């Protein structure tokens, strides 16, 4: 798909590392100019220099800062709503603050950014919105009520907006990865090891074994799917939830 996005501008939130960084590299490799947005400016700067993009530091839980970031971006052809957090707790330990924090970043911020940028895509007659949800958005897992709720919200938003956008030239889809080899998963492995007394290797293996393929997903596999959705030939893929977890949700 080299050159297929030449002349297009993409915005990737949570673009400094992990899945977001892999998607930013893939889009840039296809010719797009990429704006990478996130909270860790050093990571963003390194990636932006690597791909010839632009680093934008922004905390998406700050609505005023988010509005300013979106306004400065102007017209965007490809929007990848990737920024998110994952926290786990039992029901009684899921505080209002935790619930609000996860829902704000994982559901409300993507909605607000999409609402701001899609009208310009409609006017141009072409656009791609790719929401990075999770297989937790099509299933349920213990101790993750807030996270599952947020990712289900993202999937629901994707499906509803697909109806609204069906005749505009703008497509919207959700990618739903399982456990992906990222720093976020490294942090989850550490928490599991601390809580259960397992070694880090045992904790990591337990996550990998949730997939029938007995492995985690590479960030580049998610990036490949995102790039595919940006292609002309994918224009009929619309309002879909594409699960990338090695078959874990089938178990």
Task: Go through each PLM region and give its residues.
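Active-site helix of classical SDR
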Residues: 114, 150, 158
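Alpha-helical segment proximal to the catalytic Tyr-Lys
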Residues: 119, 163-164, 235
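C-terminal substrate-recognition "lid" of short-chain dehydrogenase/reductases
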Residues: 126, 213-244, 249-250
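Residue(s) in the substrate-gating loop at a strand-loop-helix junction
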Residues: 134
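Short, small/polar-rich loop/turn modules that mediate ligand/substrate recognition or access, typified
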Residues: 166, 171, 237-239
């Amino acid at each position: 798909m080299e050159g297929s996005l030449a002349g297009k501008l993409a915005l990737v939130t949570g673009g400094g590392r992990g899945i977001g960084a892999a998607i930013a590299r893939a889009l840039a490799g296809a010719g797009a100019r990429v704006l990478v947005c996130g909270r860790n400016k050093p990571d963003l700067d390194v990636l932006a220099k690597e791909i010839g993009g632009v680093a934008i530091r922004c905390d998406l839980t700050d609505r005023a800062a988010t509005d300013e970031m979106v306004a400065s971006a102007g017209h965007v052809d490809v929007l990848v709503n990737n920024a998110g957090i994952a926290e786990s707790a039992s029901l009684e330990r899921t505080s209002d603050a935790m619930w609000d924090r996860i829902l704000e970043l994982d559901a409300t911020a993507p909605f607000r950014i999409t609402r701001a940028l899609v009208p310009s895509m409609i006017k141009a007659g072409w656009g791609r919105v790719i929401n990075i949800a999770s297989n937790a958005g099509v299933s349920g897992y213990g101790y993750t009520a807030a996270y599952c709720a947020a990712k289900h919200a993202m999937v629901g938003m994707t499906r509803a907006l697909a109806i609204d956008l069906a005749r505009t030239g703008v497509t919207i889809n959700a990618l739903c990865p399982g456990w992906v080899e990222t720093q976020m998963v490294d942090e989850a492995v550490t928490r599991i090891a601390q809580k259960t007394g397992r070694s880090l290797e045992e904790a990591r293996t337990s996550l990998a074994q949730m997939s029938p393929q007995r492995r985690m997903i590479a960030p580049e596999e998610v990036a490949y799917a995102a790039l595919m959705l940006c292609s002309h030939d994918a224009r009929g893929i619309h309002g879909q939830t594409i699960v990338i977890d090695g078959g874990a949700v089938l178990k």
